[in-house]
């Protein structure tokens, strides 16, 4: 929302001009909290459900696990601001790239990476890496970061961050990469995963004229090798069987390897099961 963006702009400019580290830290905390509130408001509007935010909990700066960093990319018409949070606190990094130029590059990257027969996406992948990751590289290495969480906004949510490229390696080759719309709505406590609490479902057959994802089978097998769990593939993957497994078997995580559609409203989202499109 424009009001949130304007407020974030004011806070970031004040933080950059702060005379003491304490003033800078306080202002950056306000920026982080404002971003979280704006993203939570977007999710409320998308799901048409005020209860979406009830899982949020207050989390102070410096409470991240060692080795974990969170990046809030905030795009403005005249620049990109990267708000980096580690166990050591918050840091602001300004990148001189206009919002329109960033959005154009993101769209180009998304379009090119969908062509599995070409590597033309690498140029865009390197450009985006130069804007989103490279300015933070020294801080990430100095803090011994192994897990990078991107609290993405807008078009940044549409691209695979792990596929950003530094000219030699993909980002996912050096860091575990996660993307979330809001960290305040994410449970950061260690999950107590039991062997078998994972349910993997997917399609390797064409359904209703739509081809199955090319690597669905190898993807599911790789996940099961790591975490075990139950598998429902092709005819076994139907709406009733999925509902039964989730309700009766105490499934904690569901991994889906199928065609999906995410619309502008929650009611427009769907996933393809063997018995057809499910909303």
Q: In which residue ranges do the predicted regions lie?
A:
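Helix-loop-helix
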Residues: 115-118
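Acidic, Ser/Thr-rich low-complexity linear motifs
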Residues: 1-7, 15-23, 42-58
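Catalytic cores of enzymes
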Residues: 56-110, 120-279
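A structural signal for alpha-helical segments
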Residues: 19-26, 120, 211
């Amino acid at each position: 929302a424009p009001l949130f963006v304007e407020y974030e702009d004011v806070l970031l400019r004040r933080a950059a001009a702060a005379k003491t580290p304490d003033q800078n830290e306080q202002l950056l905390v306000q920026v982080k909290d404002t971003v979280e509130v704006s993203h939570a408001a977007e999710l409320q509007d998308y799901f048409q459900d005020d209860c979406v935010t009830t899982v949020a909990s207050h989390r102070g700066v410096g409470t991240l696990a060692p080795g974990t960093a969170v990046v809030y990319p905030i795009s403005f018409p005249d620049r990109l601001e990267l708000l980096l949070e580690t166990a050591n606190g918050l840091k602001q990094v300004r990148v001189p790239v206009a919002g329109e130029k960033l959005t154009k590059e993101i769209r180009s990257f998304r379009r090119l990476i969908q062509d599995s027969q070409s590597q033309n996406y690498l140029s865009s992948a390197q450009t985006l890496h130069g804007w989103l990751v490279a300015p933070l590289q020294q801080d990430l290495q100095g803090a011994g970061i192994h897990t990078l969480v991107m609290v993405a906004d807008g078009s940044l949510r549409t691209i695979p961050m792990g596929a950003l490229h530094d000219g030699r390696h993909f980002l996912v080759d050096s860091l575990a990469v996660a993307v979330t719309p809001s960290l305040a709505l994410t449970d950061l406590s260690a999950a107590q995963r039991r062997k078998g609490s994972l349910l993997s479902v997917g399609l390797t057959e064409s359904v209703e004229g739509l081809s199955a994802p090319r690597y669905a089978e190898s993807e599911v097998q790789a996940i099961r090798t790591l975490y075990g769990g139950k598998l429902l593939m092709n005819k076994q993957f139907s709406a009733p069987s999925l509902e039964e497994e989730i309700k009766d078997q105490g499934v904690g995580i569901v991994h889906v390897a199928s065609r999906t559609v995410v619309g502008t409203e929650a009611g427009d989202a769907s996933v393809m099961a063997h018995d057809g499109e499910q909303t």
